[in-house]
Amino acid sequence: MPRFRMTVEYDGTPYYGWQRQENGPSVQGALEAAVRSLTGESVSIRGAGRTDSGVHAVGQVAHIDLSRDWEPYKLRNALNAHLAMAGEAVAVLDAAAVTEDFDARFSALRRHYLYRIICRKSRLALEHKRAWWVSKDLDHERMHEAAQMLVGRHDFTTFRSVHCQANSPVRTLDRLDVTRNGDLIEIRATAQSFLHNQIRSFAGTLKLAGEGGMTPDDVRAALEARDRKACGPVAPPDGLYFMQVDYPDVIPPRRRPEIEMTEDAD
């Protein structure tokens, strides 16, 4: 069956997360419904990351197998039309034909996330549900120093949800940087994979560091404790964005049969 890779953007606010839900809207469910409306096929779409309820994405990647071949741009445009008609806060930014050995989840080399904090006295209006509003100022340089205690290969038991289903709490964190531009503090995290609630746990702990409630040494001690109780509060989902997925430099596009290179009559 022809396989397609898609880059997907979504506002996570109205959804119960990426993964299909029985009792609530999901991003995966919205995309699968759009495919069903377009093609009549019931398909399963696999994403590179299973974002939680309220988490946004500007560069989620997914793959899908369809019974017929498509020009990728036509598939993108058609899916966007059906998503718009359904009132979904989801958009397909790009589509590409790929070989069957491409897997959006398991072919990924690195995943990039961004967490946004806005520090100001007034509540958020335009950025409501787009960032974590903190009414007191934070020391972003102290936050960055504390963040470096977490970079590298560690047992991240302290920073994962008690409901995390990963077999091992050991992960390699390639990057955890904290920068500031005016009222906006950005936390950028990169790794091949993350544990459930790991980045939001980082953000909550780094906020404490920015307030002066934890030193960089305290953050290192929390990591080494391997105890969830040593973690700071889990930051709200509003500020978290799935930014990008890196794949091997060369993923050969799937060659389409010559007979299917012609434009569709309809």
From Swiss-Prot:
GO function term, MF aspect, one: RNA binding
CDD domains tied to this protein: PseudoU_synth_EcTruA
Binding site for substrate: Y113
EC annotation from Swiss-Prot or TrEMBL: 5.4.99.12
Record flagged with keyword Kinase: no
Pfam family, one: PseudoU_synth_1
Keyword Membrane: no
SUPFAM superfamilies for the chain: Pseudouridine synthase
Catalytic residues (UniProt): D52 (nucleophile)
Keywords on record: Isomerase, tRNA processing
Function according to Swiss-Prot or TrEMBL: Formation of pseudouridine at positions 38, 39 and 40 in the anticodon stem and loop of transfer RNAs.
Subunit field text: Homodimer.
Protein name in the entry: tRNA pseudouridine synthase A
Organism: Agrobacterium fabrum (strain C58 / ATCC 33970) (Agrobacterium tumefaciens (strain C58))
Gene that encodes it: truA
